[in-house]
C-alpha cells in the first residue's frame, strides 16, 4: 500500500542525516542497508496493546542512547508517551492521515474514540509531522496544537525529474503488446488495493458512472486498465467488463511501467483522507491526472502545471468530459520535483528534528 511504501522511502532518504534504528514487525523482512532494523513487534493485530513493548523499547533506548522517538500514525501513542516520560526522549508523531476522520468517512462508529486518542497523542509530541497543509491546519485548530510544533512533511517521489519521452513510449509499447491495446487508443489507469473501501468505491464509480459516459463518446478511443490486488471475488476479475473497454491487470510486479505508459491516471476517490500517493507517483512519471477534489488534497495546483485537472466531487459527467479532452502532451513542471522529491522532504524533517 502507498502508506507502507511512503514510510520505507521516507526512512531511506532520512537515514543519511541521522543515526537511525527502526523497530518493526517480525514479518518485515525487507533488506535495508541505510539503517539498523530490529524486528521486535509481533505480527498479531493485538501488538498495539502489548504492554511488554514498553520494557523492550525502554531497554533498547537506553542501550543505544536514543534521544528522539518517531512513531508512524497515532496507534502507538500510549507507548510513545510512556517512553517520553520514562526515557526522556523527544517524541515525534508522523501522521499520514487524520485517522479518525478517515474512519469516519468509512462509516466506523468508533471514530470519535480514536479522535480523542489521536488528539492526546499529538498533544504530547515535541513535533508533529502532517502529510499535507490541510491536516496541519486541522491539528492546530481542532487538536489545539501549537503551530510551531506542526509541520507539513508530505509523501514524496524518488526521482528528481520525469522519465524521457522514449521511456514513456517504450512503456506504452509494452502495455499495448501485453494487453492487446491499439497504439492509437488512450490508456487510462487506476490502481490501488482493491479491498480498501475508498478504492473499491472508486472502482465502482469507474465501472458504473465514468466508463458508460466515456463509451458514449464516439470519437474517444480508450482502454481503462485496473491494477491492484485483493479484488473481492464478487467482481469475478471484471470479466463482465472485458467487452466494455476495461482491462483487469491485477497485481503487477512493477507499477512504474504503468504510470510511465498510461496517458491518463483517473482518480475518482471521494473519501479515505490523507494524500493520495498514487497521484504523486502518476504526476512524477509525467502521466496526466484527472481527479476529484477530495482525491487531490495535498497536491498543490500551483506546481502541477496543466498535468492535473481537478473536478468537483460526484460530477461524473464533467469528469468524463475532462478525460476525453485531457492534454497528455504538456510535461510536469520542475516545481513539482522541488516540492515532492524525497531528498528535499527528508532534509526538512531531519533539520526540524536536529533543531529540537
Identify the meaning behind each predicted range.
Residues 126, 245, 260-274, 287:
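Acidic donor-binding loop of glycosyltransferase active sites
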Residues 12, 55-59, 85, 109-131:
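Membrane-proximal helix-turn-helix segments that form the acceptor-binding/catalytic region
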Residues 6-13, 157-238, 248, 252-253, ...:
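Conserved catalytic-core segment of nucleotide-activated headgroup transferases in glycan assembly
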